[in-house]
């Protein structure tokens, strides 16, 4: 993977595919408009995911991005593919993921029973694939399954791919206070998984992701909590985790997973939130202008906020002032 290689700096922009050039080409070829879908588009996406094979990390990234773009555009791609190939596990998973994207947006699943059935059918047809179980984890967020059922789905997903990034993110969201969980549940989850996850695993950013969400939650409350939110980064396990991430993640070749640039966005944001903009400079450089909507869009347009913090990091580096 050519992550953080010889690309020249580019103007900040949102790139759903991140550094997956093959995925970017497919996205450009698939219609962005709702309504009718050409059979060639179905063939293109089906062939593309088939070629991805059993690289579960890369497959998850590609399916999630394609599903997200399909849901946002209102395209009939998922339905057209499932109609054409109702026994294709890729078609079943893709259609279910698009349904999940709609459900997360609307906070309600249309025909949840059908989507669940599709996931189980996909799991039967492709038993080694963790993705049907990951989609079920996402559905559990909306349907608020009992924790025992969620844990069973979690074991199915991570039993197939122990460090599956999306599985960890879905579980984190399910446990969050914003979705009916609690801060204590999130902390318990992070405490359990922290020591087990390799430093460069696809899910390595889960602790920092949880910390950023906690920070944003404090800021959103306003008042004293917002004014003192930056204290979250001072001392303790969160500070230690941020320090380790700052020293390792942006090194060329350290991360190899498909969504590494998304995790670097989280790191850059966390360093800026902690008053360490100077330390974020090398992370911004590694990103080469690739912006993810979250976490930057929490308090304004993502690209604009990214540019502002990047400029602040550059000024601080030139002035030699830590936390500028």
Residue ranges and their predicted role:
Residues 47-66, 86-104, 127-138, 160-177, ...:
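Amphipathic alpha-helical repeat scaffolds of TPR domains
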């Amino acid at each position: 993977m050519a992550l953080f290689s010889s690309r020249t700096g580019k103007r900040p922009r949102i790139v759903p595919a991140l550094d997956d050039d093959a995925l970017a080409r497919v996205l450009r070829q698939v219609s962005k408009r709702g309504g009718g879908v050409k059979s060639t588009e179905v063939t293109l996406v089906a062939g593309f995911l088939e070629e991805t094979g059993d690289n579960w990390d890369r497959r998850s990234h590609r399916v999630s991005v394609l599903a997200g773009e399909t849901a946002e555009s209102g395209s009939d791609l998922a339905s057209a593919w499932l109609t054409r190939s109702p026994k294709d596990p890729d078609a079943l998973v893709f259609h279910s993921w698009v349904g999940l994207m709609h459900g997360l947006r609307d906070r309600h699943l249309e025909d949840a029973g059908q989507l669940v059935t599709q996931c189980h059918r996909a799991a039967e047809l492709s038993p080694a694939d963790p993705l049907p179980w990951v989609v079920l984890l996402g559905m559990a967020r909306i349907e608020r399954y009992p924790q025992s059922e969620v844990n069973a789905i979690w074991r199915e997903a991570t039993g197939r791919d122990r460090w599956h990034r999306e599985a960890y993110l879905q579980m984190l969201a399910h446990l969050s206070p914003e979705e009916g969980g609690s801060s204590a549940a999130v902390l318990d989850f992070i405490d359990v998984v922290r020591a087990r996850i390799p430093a460069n695993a696809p899910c390595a950013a889960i602790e920092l992701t949880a910390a950023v969400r906690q920070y944003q939650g404090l800021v959103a409350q306003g008042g004293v909590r917002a004014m003192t939110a930056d204290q979250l980064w001072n001392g303790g396990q969160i500070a230690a985790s941020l320090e380790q991430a700052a020293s390792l993640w942006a090194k060329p070749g350290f991360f190899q997973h498909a969504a590494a640039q998304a995790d670097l966005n989280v790191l850059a944001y966390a360093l800026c939130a902690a008053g360490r903009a100077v330390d974020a400079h090398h992370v911004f450089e590694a990103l080469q202008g690739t912006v993810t909507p979250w976490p930057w869009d929490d308090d304004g347009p993502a690209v604009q906020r990214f540019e502002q913090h990047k400029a602040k990091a550059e000024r601080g580096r030139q002035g030699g002032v830590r936390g500028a």
